[in-house]
Design a protein with these regions (language model features):
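Oxyanion-hole/transition-state-stabilizing segment in secreted/luminal serine hydrolases
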Residues: 1-13, 40
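Generic anion/oxyanion-binding catalytic loop in active/binding sites
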Residues: 3, 21, 101
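Amphipathic, non-transmembrane alpha-helical secondary structure
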Residues: 12-19, 23, 113, 117
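Catalytic His-Asp segment of secreted/periplasmic serine-dependent ester chemistry enzymes
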Residues: 37-152
């Protein structure tokens, strides 16, 4: 069995593809909400690197151009990972020493729950009326007020 070849689209093709989804959603009467990619856990000398720059920028530009709600998961998850720190954030990703597995892209269950929490927090910012339906705190375990103190 061979591993599938990774498939990538440059940011222009990616934006065109996402734009098609927005158009289709609107044609079907849905209200689209765009979400930038989840940050990868990639640190260099203690600094978290943005590995999705052009993709995230493409989604942000499309959301602005098409007047579509945006949850900036890339920004929020980078804030979250910085707040956790390099070593503690490892526990949220697929690091399985017994299987010699180190995966800083895919999440363990607790990481998936935390990221879902970030998405809900972003959704609540888009629609304050959702607050009454949210039954779980959405600080996502970040220390202090890392998410609410953001300046940008």
């Amino acid at each position: 069995m061979t591993k599938a070849t990774p498939k990538y689209a440059d940011d222009t093709v990616y934006q065109i593809s996402v734009d098609k989804v927005v158009t289709l959603a609107r044609e079907k009467g849905a209200t689209p909400i765009l979400i930038t990619p989840l940050a990868r856990r990639k640190f260099d000398h203690g600094q978290l690197l943005d590995t999705h720059g052009l993709y995230s920028q493409a989604v942000r530009a499309l959301a602005e151009r098409e007047n579509v709600g945006l949850i900036d998961l890339n920004r929020d998850s980078m804030d979250w990972l910085r707040a956790l720190g390099e070593a503690p954030s490892r526990d949220f990703f697929m690091h399985v020493p017994a299987q010699n597995q180190t995966d800083d892209t895919h999440l363990q269950h607790r990481g998936a729950v935390a990221v879902a929490c970030l998405v809900v927090a972003g959704w609540k910012q888009l629609d304050a009326g959702l607050q009454e339906y949210v039954v779980r705190d959405t600080d996502c375990g970040a220390r202090g007020t890392a998410l609410s103190d953001r300046t940008t």
